[in-house]
Amino acid sequence: MNPNQKIITIGSVSLTIATACFLMQIAILATTVTLHFKQNECSIPANNQVVPCEPIVIERNITEIVYLNNTTIEKEICPEVVEYRNWSKPQCQITGFAPFSKDNSIRLSAGGDIWVTREPYVSCDPSKCYQFALGQGTTLDNKHSNGTIHDRIPHRTLLMNELGVPFHLGTKQVCIAWSSSSCHDGKAWLHVCVTGDDRNATASFIYDGMLVDSIGSWSQNILRTQESECVCINGTCTVVMTDGSASGRADTRILFIREGKIVHISPLSGSAQHIEECSCYPRYPNVRCVCRDNWKGSNRPVIDINMADYSIDSSYVCSGLVGDTPRNDDSSSSSNCRDPNNERGNPGVKGWAFDNGNDVWMGRTISKDSRSGYETFRVIGGWATANSKSQTNRQVIVDNNNWSGYSGIFSVESKSCINRCFYVELIRGRPQETRVWWTSNSIVVFCGTSGTYGTGSWPDGANINFMPI
C-alpha cells in the first residue's frame, strides 16, 4: 500500500469513528431531553392514564437524581394534591380519654422567661397540633405581670406554638387579640382576632398569614368569640361571635368565612337564650357547638350550624348532670333539652360536650361552686333524653384540691375516624392566690381512646411560694 492509500484509509477510518461519535452524542441528547420533559407527567398505574402536573399546587419540590453514563438527570416527583378538609369520616368510638400533652408553663416560669397567658386552646392542621393562648404582653417574672387578671388590654396578642412547647420568648405572636379563634381548612390557617375598645372593637380575619377581612362591633358591648378552634368544611370556616351583655340579652351571630373573606353572616335562632365561648366540632356535613349560657342556665346551650344553607338552630344539652359552673348539686340540677334551667346561670365558665348517639360525653369542674378540679364522663341518653342522669366512664383529670379553669374541644382526623380531644386551662395566681400579683395558666390535654386507661391527677403543679411575686 503506497503512502497515499494509507492516508486515505486512515482518513476514512477516522471519519467513520467521528460520525459514530456524533450519532451517539445525538442519541444521548435525545434521551436526556425526553427524560427531562417526562418529569411533567404523572402516570397512574390503575388505568394507565397520564395526568399533567401543571394544575397541581406544589408546596415543596422533591428532586430525584438519577445517574446514567455520567449524565445527571433531575426529575421532579409530582406531590400530593392539597385539599380542603371535609371531616366526612365517622366519629371514633371511645371508652374514655388518655393523657396526651402538658406544657408545665407555670412551673417553668419560676426560673425562665415564659409568657403570661390565659384563654388557651388547641387546634391541629392535617399533620400537627398547635397550642394557642392570649398573651398579656409580658413574661411572668416581669413587673408588667402585675394586674394581668384583666382580660382586655391593647397589648394582648394571640400566641402559637407546637403543642407541648411552652410560650417562650421566641414564640410567634400571630395577631393582636384579647379574644380569638383559629382553625386550618386543609390549606392554610385562619385566625379570628378581636381587639380594640370595649365599645367599638374590631375582629380581624387573617388567612395564610395575611389580613383578608375585618368586621367592627355591632352592639358596641365587647365583641368576642370562642376562645377555642373554629371549624372548616370544604373550604368554608364558621365561627360564633357575640356582642352585647355578658349577663343579659346579647346579639350572637354565626360567621362563614372562605379563605379569610366573610361570605355570610347568620343570626342566632332557636331556643338558646345566651351564647358565650362556644366549643365547636365538625359533625359532617355540618358543625355543632356547645357553649356557655352566662345569663339564665347552668345547662349548656347547643348550636347546630348548617354549612350548606347557613341556617342555624339552637337548644340545650339534655343531660340533667349539667356542665357549667356554678351549678346546683347533681340531685337537684335539671335540663329539658330546650330551655335554660334558670339554675345559677351567672357567671359560668367555658366548657365542652359532644354527642355520641343518644349519649353525651362531657367535662366539667368537680366543684359545683368554683373553678377547681376537673372530671369527664358519659351520660347515658344525655343527648336525647331530658334530665337524664345515668353517669358512666367517669375520670378525674384534675383533683378537687387544685385549680382548673376554661376547657374546650378540638378534633383530630385519623385514618378511619374523627377523634375528639379536650384541653383544660390550669389557672394560677389571682384571684384565688393573692400572694402574687399576676394571673396565668398552663394546660393539660387528653384525647379519646378506644383502649383501657388508669387513674391519676394532672394539676398545674407549681408551688406558689417558689414563684415570682
Curated annotation (Swiss-Prot):
Keyword match Metal-binding: yes
Topological domains annotated Virion surface: 30-469
Residue ranges of the region described as Disordered: 325-349
Keyword Transcription attributed: no
Binding locations of substrate: R118, R152, E276, E277, R292, R371
A single GO cellular-component term on record: membrane
Region Head of neuraminidase: start-end pairs: 91-469
Regulation: Inhibited by the neuraminidase inhibitors zanamivir (Relenza) and oseltamivir (Tamiflu). These drugs interfere with the release of progeny virus from infected cells and are effective against all influenza strains. Resistance to neuraminidase inhibitors is quite rare.
Other facts: The influenza A genome consist of 8 RNA segments. Genetic variation of hemagglutinin and/or neuraminidase genes results in the emergence of new influenza strains. The mechanism of variation can be the result of point mutations or the result of genetic reassortment between segments of two different strains.
Self-association state and partner proteins as the record states: Homotetramer.
Record's protein name: Neuraminidase
Organism: Influenza A virus (strain A/Turkey/Minnesota/833/1980 H4N2)
Lineage: Viruses, Riboviria, Orthornavirae, Negarnaviricota, Polyploviricotina
Gene transcribed to yield this protein: NA
